[in-house]
């Protein structure tokens, strides 16, 4: 009986979340890793003015409750950024809720 009670306490699942790193850490990661996506969640106009080379643009406002065709692999490493860090945090939270498992928020550029 005691064993059953104790095993029930250990079944709580960890809350799904994203990681935050600095831009410097992200630069190092981009130099060392492969197979990642850089996601710019600013507006299309902001993206057209300046963006990290190789980044794809999906505006934070367009990330909702449906799967994103541009991001088919929910386990792929995705580095998320915006201008100041606010929208990248919001987008990262939404991506986690959509089931993405490897989100890293790198703030603003």
Task: Identify the function of each model-found stretch.
Residues 18-20, 38, 55-57, 103-105:
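Conserved beta-strand scaffold positions in the cores of enzyme catalytic domains, especially
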Residues 29-33, 44, 61, 81, ...:
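Structured segments of extracytoplasmic/periplasmic soluble domains
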Residues 68-109:
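Catalytic cysteine-centered active loop of the rhodanese-like fold, especially the PTP/DSP P-loop
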